[in-house]
Design a protein with these regions (language model features):
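Substrate-binding cleft of secreted/luminal carbohydrate-active enzymes
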Residues: 26-30, 34-51, 69-140
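Beta-strand-rich modules
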Residues: 199-218
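Short beta-strand segments within Ig-like beta-sandwich modules, predominantly Fibronectin type-III
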Residues: 187-194
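Aromatic-lined carbohydrate-recognition surfaces of secreted/lumenal glycan-active proteins
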Residues: 1-22, 71-80
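Active-site proximal loops enriched in glycine and acidic residues that flank catalytic Cys/His/Asp
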Residues: 2, 42-45, 77-79, 111-112, ...
Length: 243
């Protein structure tokens, strides 16, 4: 997670008086990223959007443009400055800028304690992360998806018990469990050690499970549907994973 400015005055419009990470810290993070030497880079973009000479969106876009190997670039956000230098809404707007610039990006928050101890910041972050999301796959490490998991469902009148296991030799890093009720899919990301779940509210229309490997690749879904359906209902919200 290098300093957010590679060299003073780069790119155009950035302050020529900024810290020279290349010359003073001996950190050529641009070379690391362009050469593919790191799996992800999280430049410390710790300035507000409105500060033109240290512009958050301009610097984020510049770092993305150096990403010749198409590895991950995540924006490191300055949560610790909320309350002292800027508001919680600043962090929310920075998250929105990250998403607007790339559909395959993300953020790293510095640091978690700032979020946990600041109710306004916690609410702002929670509003942006309303649904679970997976870390994008590192396909340069491994692009082969895992085998689809084995899934069984035992149902009673008002609940069902779901059990699953790996479908192949490769252990899962996590699981993506999707449940459909009234044509709306909801998604949970579960730890590798969890191999079962009981749904007690009502019997769903369909259940789907995917394995996620250590590089972030998703397996094909294993889908179980009650006899009254010939196939899983179409998605009308909640997630796009089933498409």
């Amino acid at each position: 997670s290098p300093f957010g400015i590679w060299r003073p005055g780069v790119p155009n419009g950035i302050s020529p008086k900024a810290l020279d990470a290349y010359g003073s810290l001996y950190a050529d993070a641009r070379l690391w990223l362009a050469s593919g030497w790191v799996d992800y880079l999280a430049p410390q973009l710790y300035w507000p959007i409105a500060q033109r000479e240290l512009s958050f969106p301009v610097l984020l876009q510049w770092w993305r443009q150096q990403n010749d190997k198409n590895h991950h670039v995540f924006a490191a956000l300055n949560d610790a400055a909320v309350g002292a230098k800027f508001s919680a809404d600043e962090i929310a707007r920075q998250i929105q800028i990250v998403r607007a610039q790339s559909s395959n990006g993300g953020e790293i928050h510095y640091h978690l304690r700032s979020v946990l101890e600041n109710s306004a910041l916690a609410a702002a972050v929670r509003a942006q992360y309303a649904r679970p999301a997976l870390v994008p796959a590192a396909t340069w490490l491994d692009s082969t998806p895992p085998e689809k998991p084995k899934l069984t469902v035992a149902g009673e009148k008002n609940s069902i018990a779901i059990r699953w296991e790996n479908g192949g030799m490769e252990p899962a890093q996590s699981w993506v469990l999707q449940v459909c009720r009234s044509n709306l899919w909801t998604t949970e990301i579960l730890p590798a050690g969890q191999t079962g779940r009981t749904l007690e509210i009502s019997r769903p229309d369909a259940v789907a499970l995917r394995a996620v490997d250590r590089s972030g690749n998703l397996s094909p879904p294993t889908v179980l549907v009650p006899k009254k359906y010939s196939s899983a209902p179409d998605i009308k919200g909640g997630t796009k994973l089933m498409k």
